[in-house]
Curated annotation (Swiss-Prot):
Assigned protein family: Belongs to the peptidase A1 family.
Database matches in Gene3D superfamilies: Acid Proteases (2.40.70.10)
Residues the record marks as active site: D118, D333
Signal peptide extent: 1-22
GO cellular component: plasma membrane; side of membrane
Protein name: Aspartic proteinase-like protein 1
Organism lineage string: Eukaryota, Viridiplantae, Streptophyta, Embryophyta, Tracheophyta
Family matches, as InterPro entries: Aspartic_peptidase_A1 (IPR001461), Aspartic_peptidase_AS (IPR001969), PEPTIDASE_A1 (IPR033121), Peptidase_aspartic_dom_sf (IPR021109), TAXi_C (IPR032799), TAXi_N (IPR032861)
Region annotation Disordered: where it falls in the sequence: 451-503
Annotated Polar residues bias: 464-482
């Protein structure tokens, strides 16, 4: 009887641990030109400053943003894919230049920031103790919030800690005179003299558990310790409103937010993105994707390291016909509106699509796409299929972008352009719509499955094998509070005595489930 009870107790504790390590955190994505974005990040006086969706002006704006992003990519020193300033030709004032944003809360007491999201970079940085930052007042931006943006001050947060040069994640340690100094950071871009620089700190990122797309109440929220760039000085396009309230890098490096959440035992090392018809969507931290998803491995390009989310396409197919010599390497870039292919492959794909279109070719003023048309009805064209290893296929069912009708005629284009880089392309958001894109960093692979985004039921993943405890990603003996007193780093299930709001990997629902299970176990034991 005793051994049976012990076995039952072990099973209960094991299941509780599994639940703990299989959590999901969700946040709403806000597309800067979506209806939601117009309502939530615009002042009433600027309601007419952005064009209507599906108008030619709307797609000119997105294409111009992509062009500037591509221009910066060619000169990037650090990141593989970087932000663009966005177009200033339509907005009557300064405008956000990124594609997707989300609200995050940092510190104690918490302060809100509307950060840009980027799968092509790694660091989370926010304006902080500003020496040279973009303006943070709402009146400066034609498409910003009715409230001002915030500036972070580490000394005002009781949970902030200095991040030292001695830490292995301090890439600028060679610039430090002493390992006890605070670690500096600089992110440089050659094009436009764009950069962000300052000092690294550690503080709390506030998260909320997600269950089947329902955000749970505040009692189930957790606080995760992450490394943050205290961005004192910005330059170039960052001063023009590219990301005035900061940027969250979602890249594969250890210093990215997903890496810290995983190492803290709060989630599996993976996240997913989905986009709805309004171009907004959701990001799910900890999502490994459904069992039915297809996948392909990420590629290592630079010094056998994963410098971004890069995959290899074996062939491009139009319908059931695969084109010869169309293999290439491509970035998966959620921060880009449209898709770019290497010149020689772009030409083959475009000509094959053009062969299936029975419509009049048309040049639209201000539209850079080469293959545009006008017709009495939208033509039916075969799907574009990107073929990966193991016969996995990414299907683009609607390869054309249709504009608003004009005088009874339908205007449409093939929204693909040459990438300008030999053998390298970039898949943008326009061809991700309708899919749940899973960035599985644990197994270093990209997953995808059909999705209606807001209707998806995202189930918590199974815990990873062997993840019964979480390694602490932060220093154990050199971490310091703002006042200079040594403070132990937070670990799963344990918090320092002087920082009661430190992260815990146990959700409220997990604890209640464990409590109820123990009551059941006690009742079963009494019957034996």
């Amino acid at each position: 009887m005793v051994s049976r009870s012990a076995f039952l107790l072990f099973c209960v504790l094991f299941l509780a641990t599994e639940e703990t390590l299989a959590s999901l955190f969700s946040s709403r994505l806000i597309h800067r030109f979506s209806d939601e974005g117009r309502a939530s990040i615009k002042t009433p006086s600027s309601s007419d400053s952005l064009p209507n969706k599906q108008s030619l002006e709307y797609y000119r704006l997105l294409a111009e943003s992509d062009f500037r992003r591509q221009r910066m990519n060619l000169g990037a020193k650090v990141q593989s894919l970087v932000p663009s300033e966005g177009s200033k030709t339509i907005s009557s004032g300064n405008d956000f230049g990124w594609l997707h944003y989300t609200w995050i809360d940092i510190g104690t007491p918490s302060v809100s920031f509307l950060v840009a999201l980027d799968t092509g970079s790694n660091l989370l940085w926010i304006p902080c103790n500003c020496v040279q930052c973009a303006p943070l007042t709402s009146t400066y931006y034609s498409s910003l919030a009715t409230k001002d943006l915030n500036e972070y001050n580490p000394s005002s947060s009781s949970t902030s800690k200095v991040f030292l040069c001695s830490h292995k994640l301090c890439d600028s340690a060679s610039d430090c005179e002493s390992p006890k100094e605070q670690c500096p950071y600089t992110v440089n871009y050659l094009s436009g003299n764009t950069s962000s620089s300052g000092l690294l700190v550690e503080d709390i990122l506030h998260l909320t558990y997600n269950t089947n797309n329902r955000l749970m109440n505040g009692s189930s929220s957790v606080k995760a310790r992450v490394v943050i760039g205290c961005g004192k000085k910005q330059s170039g396009d960052y001063l023009d409103g590219v990301a005035p309230d900061g940027l969250m890098g979602l890249g594969p490096a250890e210093i990215s937010v997903p890496s810290f959440l995983s190492k803290a035992g709060l989630m599996r090392n993976s996240f997913s993105l989905c986009f709805d018809e309004e171009d907004s969507g959701r990001i799910y931290f900890g999502d490994m994707g459904p069992s039915i998803q297809q996948s392909t491995p990420f590629l290592q390009l630079d010094n056998n390291k994963y410098s971004g989310y890069i995959v290899g396409v074996e062939a491009c197919c139009i319908g059931n016909s695969c084109l010869k010599q169309t293999s290439f390497t491509t970035f998966i870039d959620s921060g880009q509106s449209f898709t770019y292919l290497p010149e020689e492959i772009y030409r083959k794909v475009a000509l094959e699509i053009d062969r299936h279109i029975n419509a009049t070719s048309k040049n639209f003023e201000g539209v850079s796409w080469e293959y545009c048309y006008e017709s009495s009805a939208e033509p039916k064209v075969p799907a574009i299929k990107l073929k990966f290893s193991h016969n996995n296929t990414f299907v683009i069912h609607k390869p054309l972008f249709v504009f608003q009708q004009s005088q009874g005629l339908v205007q449409f284009c093939l929204p693909i352009s040459p990438s300008g880089q030999e053998g390298i392309g970039s898949i943008g958001q326009n061809y991700m719509r309708g899919y749940r894109m899973v960035f599985d960093r644990e197994n270093m692979k990209l997953g995808w499955s059909p999705s209606k985004c807001q209707e998806d039921k995202i189930e918590p993943p199974q815990a990873s094998p062997g993840s019964t405890s979480s390694p602490n990603p932060l220093p154990t003996d050199e971490q310091q509070s703002r006042g200079g007193h040594a403070v132990s780093p937070a670990i799963a299930g344990k918090t320092p005595s002087k920082t009661p709001s430190s992260s815990s990997s146990y959700s409220f629902s997990s604890i209640m489930r464990l409590f109820n299970s123990l009551l059941l176990l006690h009742w079963l034991a009494s019957l034996m």
